[in-house]
Amino acid sequence: MKNILDFTLEELKEWMKENGESAFRAKQIFDWIYKKEVFNFEEMKNISKALIGKLSENFYIGIPEVIDYLSSSEDGTRKILLGLGDGNIIECVIMRYKYGNSICVSTQIGCRMGCKFCASTLEGMVRNLTAGEILSEVLIGQKLLGERISNIVLMGSGEPLDNYDNVMKFLELVNADYGLNIGQRHITLSTCGLVPKIREMADKEMQVTLAISLHAVSDEKRKTIMPIANKYSISEILDACNYYIEKTGRRITFEYSLVSGVNDTKEDAKSLGRLLKGMLCHVNLIPVNEIKENEFKKSTKKDIETFLNTLKTYGVEATVRREMGSDINAACGQLRRSYIKSKGLKL
């Protein structure tokens, strides 16, 4: 049995022809799934019983079970805990902005990158999500919300470029006009800096916004909080980013989690300003999410403001990320981890 959400329209048309059906049936089925949010073959009214039988024998519509659905009383942020068919659990977050609804999706179950301040990496890597499983987060999120999701950020659990092929196919599926038709410029992909994959993605000349999890201004300091820094230097990452800008014309976002006493001094801000001065980029300053498993503390408001203002003196565009859903632990990995522990399950 295959997850039909993993299929492109052309792939499903080919299956139809191979199984004695008209190719146009593929579009009808996808209309039911993507336009009408019908996730059961039996409910597709203009599909013959014979074809429904064939579909049921060969495919399933991989919509996950909703285990928990939390809504923030502060800002309307929604956090969804989802159960997959194999018993694994993932989570996604919907954030409401003036310009529309944005969903933060997971691309892996767990993560093997080992970043010290991230909850999703604490139990290590379980497995990659397929393109259809990533897509299902958007589908179920949109159905639960009852409104269109217009923006996607690949910033949930997992390193997207460590699941490159599935993520690239997801981007194709979610952008397709027969599907959700979410434009590439409305999608942001966050990576800790897998240099070869950044360059490979640049060669596709996609219009996806690339966000780099930087979090330190020297290789030495970065190695203490991000193991990937032992493989790729900041210089190599910046070279890859400039290549991405050259190929796509898109501005790079640099994510910088501010950790009290670790990377939030005025000297750190000056070093970051010198590093990025003149580059087509934007810095997103993130007050770190505190988790029990480490001792990292959030920077003070005064230190955050000083850091921000110092960056601006170098002509570097920067903003402080608005904290959303703090009353429901909306940071990636937190809800999944607390749920698994509460049930006494193995991480």
UniProtKB/Swiss-Prot annotation:
One annotated Gene Ontology cellular component of this protein = cytoplasm
Tell me which residues bind [4Fe-4S] cluster: 111, 115, 118
Cited InterPro entries: Aldolase_TIM, Elp3/MiaA/NifB-like_rSAM, Methyltransferase_A, RlmN_N, RNA_MTrfase_RlmN, rRNA_lsu_MTrfase_RlmN/Cfr, rSAM
Q: Has keyword Repressor?
A: no
Which Enzyme Commission number(s) are listed? Answer: 2.1.1.192
Principal localization reads cytoplasm
SUPFAM superfamilies reported in the protein's UniProt record: Radical SAM enzymes
Supply the PANTHER family for this chain: 23S RRNA METHYLTRANSFERASE (PTHR30544), RADICAL SAM CORE DOMAIN-CONTAINING PROTEIN (PTHR30544:SF5)
Instruction: Report the function annotation for this chain.
Output: Specifically methylates position 2 of adenine 2503 in 23S rRNA and position 2 of adenine 37 in tRNAs.
Of which family is this protein a member? Belongs to the radical SAM superfamily. RlmN family.
This chain belongs to which protein, by name? Probable dual-specificity RNA methyltransferase RlmN
Organism for this UniProt entry: Clostridium perfringens (strain 13 / Type A)
Q: What is the lineage of its organism?
A: Bacteria, Bacillati, Bacillota, Clostridia, Eubacteriales
